[in-house]
Amino acid sequence: MKSPLGMGATSGVTWAGFGKDASRLRAQRGECRFVPVRGTQSFKMAERPEPLRLGSTAPNFKAETTNGPIDFHEFIGDNWVVLFSHPEDYTPVCTTELGAFAKLEPEFAKRGAKLIGLSANTIDSHSGWIKDINEVSGSNLTFPIIGDKQRQVALLYDMIDHQDATNVDSKGIAFTIRSVFIIDPKKKIRLILSYPASTGRNSAEVLRVLDSLQTGDKYRVTTPINWVPGDDVIVAPPVSNEEAKKLFPEFRIVKPYLRFTPLPKEKATVS
């Protein structure tokens, strides 16, 4: 199958269920192609895929990772998954980010969530770089990192930066941006974040959002600004006051549309 970048045969990634039938890929995600920008070596996306939105089914793919080959939907299984991309291996901001995620991996695991990284580098590059990450951060990085040299998964998930002229490789082709996707066990996308290449992410914030999503799914509540587990939550608007009295005996009305409540003690911790 011809690479979406027009650079020949693919390597490391295949479109699960598509084989060599590119038309089926176009039907699923919209046709995307690259054209050279006159006077530069960079490439500009002429037609971008249909954007993924909150609630979209996470597109499936097969890829090589530092932990071996995966089918993404099989990798998700019955778990939550945090899929995140970084621009390039052996770079300063990315090194600090992956070290931080590696240190928090046990906390994600407690919540039934898997981590998986991605960049437009080879598996060999990832494997060598992991040694640096562990040395610099004092971490033990064990989660898989996808080798997406041809940017196929990056295109599928719209992780390509086509505005920042500094975020390109030696051929002028755009690197991946700092994208984050939280995907639930039903394979639905629940969070999408995009950071510029110059700005490192906050791994604790990704964990906080996961806590919020899991709490909201389990109980009929939403979470206010800066919420962390143990703080009061907000009774969801569809819940009537009569229902709220049964569900949350300690709820209080601040405004008719704003009702706070602590979760019962046994409900305060997200499993």
Residue ranges of predicted features:
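N-terminal chloroplast transit peptides
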Residues: 2-10
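Chalcogenol-based redox active-site neighborhoods
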Residues: 17, 32-271
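Acidic, Ala/Val/Gly-enriched low-complexity intrinsically disordered segments
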Residues: 9, 13-16, 21-22, 27, ...
